[in-house]
Amino acid sequence: MAGSTAGYGQIIEYIQDKLYLASYDHTPDAKTPFPYPAEQPKSPSKRRAQASPSKKRSPVYFTVDDTLLYNSFHADFGPLHIGHLYRFAVHFHDLLAANNDRAIVFYSRTDARSRANAACLVACYMVLIQSWPPHLALAPIAQADPPYMPFRDAGYSQADFILNIQDVVYGVWKAKEQGVCGLRDFSLEEYEKFERVDMGDFNWISPHFLAFASPQHQPVAPIPRDSPEYAALPSTVSEVRSSRLPLPFKNVLEHFATRGVGLVVRLNSELYSPSYFTALGISHIDMIFEDGTCPPLPLVKKFIRMAHEMINVKHKAIAVHCKAGLGRTGCLIGAYLIYRYGFTANEVIAFMRFMRPGMVVGPQQHWLHLNQGSFREWWFEDCMKEKLAQMQPNPVTPGRSPAKHRAAAVTTPPQNGHSKRSALGEIDNNEATPIYDDNLPAPTPGQPRKSHRKDSRHHPYSRTASGSLVVDKDTRKTRRSTDSSESEEETQLRMLAKQRSSKSPAASPGQRSISYSATVTASYTLNDDIHEDRENWGGAAQPPKTPVTSKTSGAVSVSKVRSSSRRVTGESKGVRKPSGRIGSTGSPVRVKAQA
């Protein structure tokens, strides 16, 4: 519910008589108009029953525009992170306790960025702390006028991918429902300390993933394990604290050793020696790809497999970093969160920025959006493999198989053993063998074209692979002996006369009667002369009549078809469909004729 006062903008009610959201271009005071609660019309009553009107107390106003500041990278302005939400909640609860009988108005300045951050902060508070469902948290601000400004990435290029408040709210809600985010074990002091560049620049994205910027320390080459230099590396937390390493690197090593980090994944070029991590018993692996680019899918799948094993088998956390711990780091962590918990791309980007501002930059946003389906597909495949493995009984040693089974045993094909699909190959073989997408040409623009060949990949109901005609013996014999000037209709009439002349009153005991049907595929071509198909016009007055069969043992149904000079050729055109309907050009039409 939203109220408004002239010249003061819109005031949105979140909790009746408790919390309101507003924006002012000046600091509000007791004289600022406040439309809640709305005055109810009074019913007529006796004078002695009228009570003296109670004085309505003015609400309490507070803002965080000058206290909770977003540290932007370039043109980004939000959303505010989880530390801001924690401080907002503490301050709001203090105001509620001190003003039990007064409404509280959380307001911001009237500029678009301040309004968006304030509304997003309140909606996330309702979801994460008050446990509201997302639709209820979004309902009060859904029809805000003017609408709230969407958020953008931290890159230096023009923003071409946006996130709105709904994405942030649903991302936070999904993380809470999956146990990925919560304030029960959240330490504000630790969060605000280690997010600073001079203190390590790292944040926990989830209980199993930590994102951090690359430490920088010389030398950068790995130190051999059997060398004296490796033995001198700090191997305990106390040795790390007493070492002469830079403070950010020291904080990283100490925090990782005490918080159960089991794997460090480096995505950028070498700026430190990995031996400092391995000396503490922390595995280290390089999965380097170019800054600002998107990782190849095989690398992503390898990362997901390693991370899943580290989390579920070794019960350790994973720390991922690139140069700044934002773009490339967000790609891999976001891919795993989509894979495991079913985030959408917008939700996971918004949630990661809620935990560590600036994550996922530029085209990496589109990359996550385009590949989110593949990540979920990998999860379903892995779950199905696990279920099938559990359902499979204990393996039994097989006995000696017969010779015919051994001869038909399936062997592993050689590398690239399948035949390449040529541009002009055998029709039947191309359809009988599986199609390898890697060998197909790239899709070309334009509309698909109809083809005379029935492709079993697109027409699964075709009866023969090559679309060949199947006709009876009499028809083939007649076609071979037919003169080039004889039309198809004359051939059918001559066959009918032959069958009538050969009828007998009783079946011969030495002969057997065979009834069979022939499937004929006929292709019709529409001529340019529209007057030759007058019976197929939509405005035809009379529908085609059902042909009457003769009362003989060898009856054949034949429809009356007008002869055309253009159809009198030596080439066989198949059997004309009795219904008078003509299939479109290039689309075979099957006609079932009773012989």
UniProtKB/Swiss-Prot annotation:
Ranges for region Disordered: 32-57, 392-595
Domain Tyrosine-protein phosphatase stretches: 233-381
Pfam short name (any one): DSPn
CDD domains: CDC14_C, CDC14_N
Gene Ontology annotations for the cellular component aspect, listed alphabetically: cell septum; cellular bud neck; cytoplasm; kinetochore; mitotic actomyosin contractile ring, intermediate layer; mitotic spindle; mitotic spindle midzone; new mitotic spindle pole body
Polar residues composition-biased segments: 502-526
Domain of life from the UniProt record: Eukaryota
Main location: nucleus
GO BP, sorted A to Z: autophagy of mitochondrion; cell division; cellular response to osmotic stress; DNA damage response; meiotic nuclear division; meiotic spindle disassembly; microtubule cytoskeleton organization; mitotic cytokinesis checkpoint signaling
First-tier enzyme category under EC: hydrolase
Biased composition (Basic and acidic residues): 471-483
Example of a GO MF term: protein tyrosine phosphatase activity
Catalytic activity: O-phospho-L-tyrosyl-[protein] + H2O = L-tyrosyl-[protein] + phosphate
Similarity section: Belongs to the protein-tyrosine phosphatase family. Non-receptor class CDC14 subfamily.
Name by which UniProt lists this protein: Tyrosine-protein phosphatase cdcA
Organism: Emericella nidulans (strain FGSC A4 / ATCC 38163 / CBS 112.46 / NRRL 194 / M139)
Top-level taxonomy: Eukaryota, Fungi, Dikarya, Ascomycota, Pezizomycotina
Gene symbol of the encoding locus: cdcA
